[in-house]
From Swiss-Prot:
Main location: cytoplasm
Protein name: Glutamate--tRNA ligase
Family: Belongs to the class-I aminoacyl-tRNA synthetase family. Glutamate--tRNA ligase type 1 subfamily.
Record function comment: Catalyzes the attachment of glutamate to tRNA(Glu) in a two-step reaction: glutamate is first activated by ATP to form Glu-AMP and then transferred to the acceptor end of tRNA(Glu).
Motif window: 'HIGH' region: 11-21
UniProt short sequence motif 'KMSKS' region, positions renumbered to this chain: 243-247
Region Disordered, residue ranges: 121-141
Subunit composition and interactions: Monomer.
Enzyme Commission identifier(s): 6.1.1.17
Gene3D superfamilies documented for this protein: 1.10.10.350, HUPs
Length: 469
């Protein structure tokens, strides 16, 4: 009988989490949801010096923002130390592990000799018990590490869902340290115990873990477990072709939220960053879960493309509910010194959003465009001199008079503009540009009739007339 699917995301909380990291959560999440399975969040915090609560909070916040809900967890490795020590004791008792008293200095010297002889640097098994072998006397006062007794012959093989068949000779692997002298278990050991105890059936992770896999499989089999299905994802590269990392300028996941990206756009973009469903570029979260499979994971490194993300985000902004966008825009407006009182005194924010969103790539851009409706304009003096010339002033005066009498609708405003243009033999930019500057403070706006219709009539007329006084 096939076991129910159980996947996991197992980040180390040692820094911020970027798009390359969170992709290793998205795919196992999607696979678990597709297969009606269980998605486990495990925090691998055994690196006590580098781990932090702030990094854990960033992981949880990023997952919540993207909607990557987990069924079990977060499970912290540091809270499972008793279990690891229990398994270590069992391994010692069964001869699956042994104490090794070789010091770091001795190991370094051994490796130097091996390199000089043209050999691969590796532990030579000095303290490995064998039938008939006489072990050295343990040095006094030295606490040993524990090493896993790796098979000496045969191969470790697995059918990777991304890389295909992988085979590693056991002769290539030395006896891995699985516990430090103070008894603290090592990462590769903890991972195996966790995956076994948690019944993980599919491990979907970055291919920087490929070299760990044969060691983990050997430990797992020694403990009587069966390896999960492995899918090692190729690296995510930045736009310069380097591995995505904080050092190479990667943004944290939450920085995308703070820059005005929508979570559905980021999920859609991440989904395509190493997986495909035919030529589909835009799809909902529900479609992604329905379509996701391991067979269509990419085999080559995926390169981050900021313009592609912007294109997707612009699409989702156009599709988004105006009330939702208004709520998202408020913090950005507040950062522009536009408070609730200013918003209440101006046009309905949702109506402004409806006008501005088709021109925006991010919610931040929407807010920057919307700001003109809620502040007193301060047009550039050079722009005023260029556009509000003596030649256009009579047309501006006639337009102000026409707007006083017109119905306050986009259509009526458009008619007033066209009538003024015809009467003064002007082209639209000759009139629209100065009106934009005087009313909104900028020449960059959507259609002038739509913009004016959102302002209060008295505001529009008074701002035009003030420039003519």
């Amino acid at each position: 009988m096939t076991r129910p699917v159980r996947t996991r995301f197992a980040p180390s909380p040692t820094g911020f989490i970027h798009l390359g990291n969170i992709r290793s959560a998205l795919y196992p999440w999607a696979f678990a949801r597709k297969m009606k399975g269980t998605f486990v969040l495990r925090i691998e915090d055994t690196d006590v010096e580098r781990s932090s609560k702030e990094a854990v909070d960033a992981i949880l916040e990023g997952m919540e923002w993207l909607g990557l809900d987990f069924d079990e967890g977060p499970i912290y490795q540091m809270q499972r130390m008793d279990r690891y020590r229990e398994v270590l004791a069992q391994m010692l008792e069964k001869g699956l592990a042994y104490p090794c008293y070789m010091s770091a200095e001795e190991l370094d010297a051994l490796r130097e000799r091996q390199r000089a002889a043209g050999l691969k640097p590796r532990y030579d098994g000095t303290w490995r018990p064998e039938p008939g072998k006489v072990l050295p006397e343990p040095p006094p006062g030295v606490k040993p590490v524990l090493r896993f007794r790796n098979p000496l012959t045969g191969t470790v093989a697995w059918d990777d869902a991304v890389k295909g068949r992988v085979e590693i000779s056991n002769e290539e692997l030395d006896d891995l340290v699985i516990a430090r002298p103070d008894g603290t278990p090592i990462y590769n050991f903890c991972v195996v115990v966790d995956d076994m105890d948690m019944g993980i059936t599919h491990v979907i992770r970055g291919d920087d873990h490929v070299n760990n896999t044969p060691r983990q499989i050997n430990i797992l089999r020694a403990l009587g477990g069966e390896p999960p299905v492995y899918a090692h994802l190729p690296t995510v590269l930045n736009e310069q072709g380097e591995k995505m990392s904080k050092r190479h300028g990667a943004m944290s996941v939450m920085a995308y939220r703070d820059a005005g990206y929508l979570p559905e756009a980021v999920v859609n973009y991440l989904a395509r960053l190493g997986w495909s469903h035919g030529d589909a570029e835009i799809f909902s979260r529900e479609q992604f879960v329905e379509w996701f499979d391991l067979e269509h994971l990419g085999k080559s490194p995926a390169q981050y493309d900021h313009n592609k993300l912007n294109w997707l985000n612009a699409h989702y902004i156009k599709e988004a509910d105006n009330a939702r966008l208004a709520a998202l825009a408020k913090p950005f407006l507040a950062a522009l010194a536009i408070d609730d009182a200013a918003l209440a005194a101006g046009p309905a924010l949702e109506a402004v959003i409806a006008l501005m969103k088709d021109r925006a790539t991010t919610v931040k851009e929407i807010a920057e465009g919307a700001a003109m409706f809620y502040r007193v304009p301060a047009p550039d003096a050079d722009a005023l001199a260029q556009h509000v010339s003596d030649a256009v002033r009579p047309a501006l005066a006639d337009l102000a008079a026409a707007l006083k009498a017109a119905d306050w609708t986009k259509e009526a405003i458009s008619a007033a503009l066209k009538a003024t243009l015809a009467a003064h033999k002007l082209k639209m930019p000759q009139l629209a540009m100065p009106v934009r500057l005087l009313v909104a403070g900028t020449t960059h706006t959507p259609s002038i009739d739509a913009v004016l219709a959102l302002f209060d009539r008295d505001v529009v007329v008074s701002r035009i007339e003030a420039a003519l006084a």
